[in-house]
Amino acid sequence: MDLEQMKVRQKHIRNFSIVAHIDHGKSTLADRILEMTDTVTKREMQDQLLDSMELERERGITIKLNAVELHYHAKDGETYIFHLIDTPGHVDFSYEVSRSLAACEGAVLVVDAAQGVEAQTLANVYLALDDDLEIVPVINKIDLPSADPERVRQEIEDVIGLDASEAVLASAKKGIGIEEMLEQIVQNVPAPDGDLEAPLKALIFDSVYDDYRGVVLSIRVVEGTVKPGDKIRLMNSGAEYEVVEVGVNSPKPLKRDFLMAGDVGYLTASIKDIQDTRVGDTVTNANNPTAKPLEGYREMNPMVYSGLYPTDNAKYNDLREALEKLQLNDAALEFEPETSQALGFGFRCGFLGLLHMDVVQERLEREFNMDLITTAPSVTYDVELTDGTHINVSNPSEMPETPLIKQINEPYVKAEIMVPNDYVGAVMELCQRKRGTFVTMDYLDDYRVNVIYEIPLSEIIFDFFDKLKSSTRGYASLDYELDGTRPSDLVKIDILLNGDKVDALSFISHRQFAQARGRVIVDKLKTIIPRQNFEIPIQAAIGAKIIARTNIKAYRKDVTARIHTGDPDRRAKLLDKQKRGKKRMKAVGTVDVPQAAFMAVLKTDEEIK
C-alpha cells in the first residue's frame, strides 16, 4: 500500500470508546454494533461478546477493556474502519476507562432512559473531556415502560453541559437507533491525524501473557507504521525486540502486513520478560526512534491493601508468577512480599477497591489454580511518631507501639452520591454513621440530588456500597476520589488465641467503636475456630489492655466411664491426671485458624453500627 492509499485509509478510520455507568447497556450496545457491521455472524453471536472473561459473563459486568476492528458501510457509500473499545463502568475500574480513552478520538456516552445521568456517567464523561474527545450522546433503553427520554435529554444538558438535541434515542436490546448512532460516529468523530512518515510512536494500552507467543501488546499507533521484522524499542525500559506479528482483533485475532498511524491492534515480539512491558509505555523503532515518548497514564494509587497467602507455602513462587502475569493485564494491581507469623510467606497487594480485590482473588484461583488465604483489607495510614518522622502503615501488624505514636492521620475520600429526593435522609444517616462530614447538596432537577460528603476511606471499603444500594433500593450511585488525610483517634486491636497474638487478625479501628468491634470479633471467632482438647481463650487487646474475652470450651473425654462408681479415690486420681494432661497440652498446643476467621474481621461492621 503506497503513501496516498494509506492517507485515504487513515481518513476513513474512527476510533471510539463506549462509556457509561454500570448496567446502562454498554456491552449490549457493543453486541448490536458487531451484528450491524457484520463483524460476527448470527450463529457466532452471544450476549456480552466482548466480555471474554468467564468471570465477566458470570457477574454480568465488564472488567477489562476490549478493542475490536469493524467495517461499516455508511450512507455516503464509503466504507469506514471503526475501532471500538468497550470499557468497564464500575468505579473500581475507572483506570481501565482512562486507558481506553487515551487510544480514541471519540466516545459514545450511553445513558439509561429510565435512570438518567448517574455518578459514574459524570466521572467517565469528565475523563473523556480531559482527553478532548468528541462525545456522541446515546439515550439507551427507550423501550422500557419507565423510560423518559426527554427528561434524560434535559439532564444531559443541565448536569453534564453537553448539547443533547442530537442525542440518539436507542434500544440496544431491540436494535433501535443503532444505525443512526453509527452515522453520527462517522460525521462527528474526527479521523486520526498522526503523521504516517514520522518515526514509529505507539501507545501500549493493554497487554496479556501468552504461553506460546510471550507478551502480546495491545497498541494504538499514533505516528508512523510497524510491520513484522521491524526492530522496536520500549522507551520506558529500553528493551529492544524484533516484531514477529502484528494484527487486529475482529473480535478474533487477524494477522496484518502492517499497522499504521490511527490503527488499534496487537503486536507480538517474543517478549518473555514481563518486567519490560508497562501499560502506558511508548513503542518506537529502534533504528529510527521518536524524539520523545507519549504522555502515558496518570498512575493509579491503590486504595485498599490486603495480604494474599498460598495455603501451601511451597506455592509461594507460583503465586509470584501468577501475580506478575496478572499485573500485565491489570496495571492497577501492586504487590510486594511480606511474611506473617501465622500464615508464612505471601504478598501485600494493593487494589483500587473491594470489587477489584475480589476479582483479582477470583482470577488467581480460576486462571492460575491458586488456593489462597486473604487477610481483611486495610488502607494506608500516615503515622507521625514522637520523634517527628512520618511512616506509612498499610498492614495493621506493622503499626508501632502506642507510646511511640504522636498522631495517626487516616485517608479521606470526597464521595459524590446521586440519589432520588425520597432517599436523601437515608443516605445522610448512612454517611453520618460512617463518620462522614457533610460538605454540600445540589438539586439536579425536581427528582434528584447530588450529596457530597467527606468520609474516611476505611469506612467506604467495607460495605458502604452495599449499604448505600440497600438503603436506597438500588437508586443511589456513588463516585469517590481521594481527598488527603485527617488526624483521627485510631487504635490497633490485637487478637490473641491461647495467649498468642495472631498478626494476620490485627486490625485498626476508631476508638469509639473499638470495644464493640473487639467484642463482636471475639464472639464470632468462638463460633468459627474448631474446639480442641484443651480450653482456648480468645482475647481482643489494645496494647496490654484486654477489652474483650471469651473461651472455647474443651472437648471432654469421660475418663471415669470404665471404673466402678463407688471408688472416689480412683475417680479423683483419673480426673487429676486428665487435668494435668490438658494443662501440658495447652502449654504446647497450637490453634489452627480457618480462612473464615480472617474474613470475620471484615463482617463486624454490620453488628456494631
Swiss-Prot record:
InterPro entries for the chain: EF-4 (IPR006297), EFG_III/V (IPR035647), EFG_V-like (IPR000640), EFTu-like_2 (IPR004161), G_TR_CS (IPR031157), LepA_C_sf (IPR038363), LepA_CTD (IPR013842), LepA_IV (IPR035654)
Pfam families, A to Z: EFG_C, GTP_EFTU, GTP_EFTU_D2, LepA_C
EC number: 3.6.5.n1
Coiled coil regions, renumbered to chain: none
CDD domains xref list: EF4_II, EF4_III, LepA, lepA_C
tr-type G domain location: 11-193
Keywords in alphabetical order: Cell membrane, GTP-binding, Hydrolase, Membrane, Nucleotide-binding, Protein biosynthesis
Entry GO CC: plasma membrane
Topology within the bilayer: Peripheral membrane protein
UniProt GO molecular function: GTP binding; GTPase activity; ribosome binding; translation elongation factor activity
Chain residues that bind GTP: 23-28, 140-143
GO biological process, one term: positive regulation of translation
UniProt key word Ubl conjugation: no
Subcellular location: Cell membrane
Keyword Isomerase: no
Swiss-Prot/TrEMBL catalytic activity: GTP + H2O = GDP + phosphate + H(+)
Role of this protein: Required for accurate and efficient protein synthesis under certain stress conditions. May act as a fidelity factor of the translation reaction, by catalyzing a one-codon backward translocation of tRNAs on improperly translocated ribosomes. Back-translocation proceeds from a post-translocation (POST) complex to a pre-translocation (PRE) complex, thus giving elongation factor G a second chance to translocate the tRNAs correctly. Binds to ribosomes in a GTP-dependent manner.
Entry's family note: Belongs to the TRAFAC class translation factor GTPase superfamily. Classic translation factor GTPase family. LepA subfamily.
Protein's name according to its UniProt entry: Elongation factor 4
Organismal lineage: Bacteria, Bacillati, Bacillota, Bacilli, Lactobacillales
